[in-house]
Amino acid sequence: YRVRKKDCIDLPEKMYVQRSIEFPEEQRKAYEQLKQSALIVLKNDEVSYNNKLTELLKLQQVANGFLKTNDGKIVDFKTNAKLKELMSILEESEDKCIIWANYVHNIEMIKKKLGEVYGKDSVVSIYGKDSVDVRNKAVENFQHNDGCRFLVGNPTVGGYGLTLTAAK
């Protein structure tokens, strides 16, 4: 049995707002260096697709405020422009918010910052390392606890099969 969203839920249209963010100097330099090496790797037909994908993922990580080194260590940039902009956006609203992030490190970074600013009970997260029970409790808390304003998660874990009506 399949039910389409348009047949059962009256949802407002999606709104997309694009914001341009200027990288701080340290982040910009790292991005440019990685971009130059990525271009060399991407143009090389002898390099595997996995290596090419790794280069692109590193660029994405830098754009998100951190870099996972080849030895697995995660290095955060001193200033995270995207996180700063997110906090600015969230200051504009008192409503509940769902924040999707692609990397576990981003989810943890966002959750930590929101906890510092709004209180640790104001935010829950859902991502792959969490058991189904832990995820369900987080969603339940977000849906029914007025003090819990933010759900930070990975769209592959929480993008389907969840009812998140608490956020506008």
Listing of model-derived features with the role each one plays in the protein:
Residues 1-95:
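Inter-lobe coupling linker of SF2 helicases/translocases
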Residues 30, 106-113, 163:
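Phosphate- and divalent-cation-binding pockets in alpha/beta enzyme and binding domains
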Residues 79-87, 104, 135-139:
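Short, well-ordered alpha-helical scaffold segments within catalytic/effector domains
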Residues 98-100, 108-158:
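Conserved helicase ATPase core of P-loop NTP-dependent helicases/translocases
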Residues 162-168:
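A short beta-strand element within the Helicase C-terminal
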